[in-house]
Design a protein with these regions (language model features):
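Flexible, glycine-/basic-rich loop-and-beta segments that form/coincide
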Residues: 158-168
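Acyl-donor binding region in acyl/amide transferases
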Residues: 2-158
Length: 168
């Protein structure tokens, strides 16, 4: 990640899981999943939850924080195939590690760099854009690139799970 991903390597906050994708011993790709962003208008509107619901259930949303297919790997449809496999693997592995089942994956695609084609091909849902203010904004000014927001439901009734008033 440090060498080939445009964001480099940074430790992920909170709960996290990383995958290395290999074929017959050859490294093809790497993915990192971690804690979801606290407040994203496009995602929050799509889910339809209240601030209180978000505060108690945000842990059920997992962020695909990094995805890198190594630059010399050229296999048609590989990226979307990996995303599909990774979603199933996260759904299986996350409860083993953290004791709860995530219901949605999220990711953010920098619009000026990428079209999000592999996410679209893997059936992720484009739900809007970020404002470009970043997670540490205190002055309500754009200081990071605007990104497309994509979600991938892991549970058929993810909205019901995330917005229910009872226990999950």
């Amino acid at each position: 990640m440090t060498r080939y991903h445009y964001l480099g390597y940074r430790p992920l906050p909170g709960a996290q899981i990383r995958y290395m994708v290999k074929d017959e011993g050859t490294l093809l790709a790497a993915l990192g999943f971690g804690a979801a962003a606290w407040k994203v208008a496009a995602r929050d509107s799509f889910i339809g939850w209240t601030p209180d619901q978000r505060a108690t259930r945000l842990h059920l949303v997992v962020n695909n924080a990094r995805f890198l297919v190594l630059p010399w790997i050229h296999i048609p449809n590989l990226a979307s195939r990996i995303l599909g496999l990774a979603a199933r693997q996260v759904y299986h592995d996350w409860p083993e590690l953290y004791g709860y089942q995530p219901v949605v994956l999220e990711t953010y695609i920098e619009k000026k760099r990428f079209a999000g084609t592999c996410y679209k091909a893997a059936n992720w849902i484009h739900v809007g854009q970020t404002t470009g203010r970043g997670k540490l904004d205190r002055h309500h000014r754009r200081n990071t690139p605007v990104k497309d927001v994509y979600l991938y439901p892991l549970h058929r009734h993810f909205r019901r799970v995330l917005t229910s008033e009872g226990t999950v």
